[in-house]
């Protein structure tokens, strides 16, 4: 949220003219048609519209509810925040600024709160990364019993993002958390899009 605010990704619902589709969905489920319209505009495609919930694929390729459009922690009753336009670029800029000002080579993760299919509750995941490979591949390594791991890839950026949320919290007004001790922070090809499963590998699309 802090990155979206800093980059001005805030929308005034008073300036939004809802489409026919937005009005129909809003009427059926007692939603604000302007908010629905913003969600549709931030979406590449609608995955599911049911029970008052909009599950979409965002322009970034993320599958989530409401395209990440959020009214929480945004001043004003008529304003909502959007996801950063390019979270990876935002992370790279922050990383570069930190290196220039502090002389430190750091990894940067921009996170947001997502729900999870078949699991109750939300958790933070990485939507933008810089300097850190978001996936940690153990394939080919052996476990303590000598078994060679064939398919074992950890979403390390998501794990760090989720751990950081325990520190930052939802109501504490702490926008940044520092994770120390992770050694791999010089991966220049980092992108959070590598965390998105390709459609050809997805059994549920």
State each model region's role.
Residues 1-22:
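N-terminal low-complexity or amphipathic/hydrophobic leaders
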Residues 82-106:
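Phosphate-interacting basic helix/loop segments used at nucleotide- and nucleic-acid interfaces
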Residues 3, 20-78, 102, 106-205:
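A structural signal for small-residue-enriched, beta-sheet-centric alpha/beta enzyme cores
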């Amino acid at each position: 949220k802090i990155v979206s605010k800093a980059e001005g990704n805030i929308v005034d619902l008073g300036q939004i003219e809802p489409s026919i589709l937005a009005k129909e969905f809003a009427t059926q489920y007692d939603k604000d048609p302007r908010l629905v319209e913003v969600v549709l505009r931030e979406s590449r495609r609608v995955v599911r519209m049911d029970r008052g919930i909009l599950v979409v694929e965002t322009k970034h390729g993320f599958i989530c509810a409401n395209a990440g459009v959020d009214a929480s922690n945004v001043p004003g009753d008529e304003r909502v925040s959007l996801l950063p336009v390019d979270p990876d670029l935002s992370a790279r800029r922050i990383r570069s600024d930190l290196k220039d000002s502090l002389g430190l080579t750091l990894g940067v993760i921009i996170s947001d709160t997502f729900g999870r299919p078949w699991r109750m509750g939300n958790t933070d995941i990485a939507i933008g990364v810089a300097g850190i490979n978001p996936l940690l591949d153990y394939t080919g390594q052996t476990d303590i019993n000598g078994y060679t791991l064939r398919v074992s890839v950890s979403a390390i950026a998501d794990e760090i993002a989720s751990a950081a949320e325990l520190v930052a919290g939802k109501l504490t007004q702490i926008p940044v958390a520092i994770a120390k001790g992770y050694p791999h922070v010089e991966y220049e090809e980092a992108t959070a899009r590598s965390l998105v499963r390709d459609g050809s590998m997805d059994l549920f699309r």
